Amino acid sequence: MKISIYATLAALSLALPAVAQEGDAAKGEKEFNKCKACHMVQAPDGTDIVKGGKTGPNLYGVVGRKIASVEGFKYGDGILEVAEKNPDMVWSEADLIEYVTDPKPWLVEKTGDSAAKTKMTFKLGKNQADVVAFLAQHSPDAGAEAAPAEGAAN
């Protein structure tokens, strides 16, 4: 009996990081105020969900969308390199959380290039999962947030 209790506790402790990443979309909507200086969330029909800047790409539909794929947006070299090396990679909630926490290390990891640069200098120090949960609400392809296609490198 003791062994099964310990095994259950061990299994639960391994699941905690996954649970801890789940965000609160309502809190994320408020937290997104920090992001709207550069980003907007605008539906394809032109409806503004969050009016914001155009320095960064429109984040409507970002979860489940291919990396660096907003038509007409001028991306930086680092994120373009990620897209080039991982052509089938889409933004997952986990990748977005990691990226908004500190874009530079994420780019270095995904490109393998320690000199990779980002145009996004802002780092979201807390509530990342909440912001990503908010963005996922406005991402019709969020359920398609599949793992990278076979042969695609992370």
Curated annotation (Swiss-Prot):
Residues 150-154 form a propeptide. Keywords: Electron transport, Heme, Iron, Metal-binding, Pyrrolidone carboxylic acid, Signal, Transport. Binds 1 heme c group covalently per subunit. GO terms for molecular function: electron transfer activity; heme binding; metal ion binding. InterPro entries: Cyt_c-like_dom, Cyt_c-like_dom_sf, Cyt_c_1A/1B. Residues 1-20 form the signal peptide. Gene3D superfamilies: Cytochrome c-like domain. Heme c binds at C35, C38, H39, M120. The modification Pyrrolidone carboxylic acid is found at Q21. The keyword Electron transport applies. This is Cytochrome c-550. It comes from Paracoccus versutus (Thiobacillus versutus). The gene is cyc.
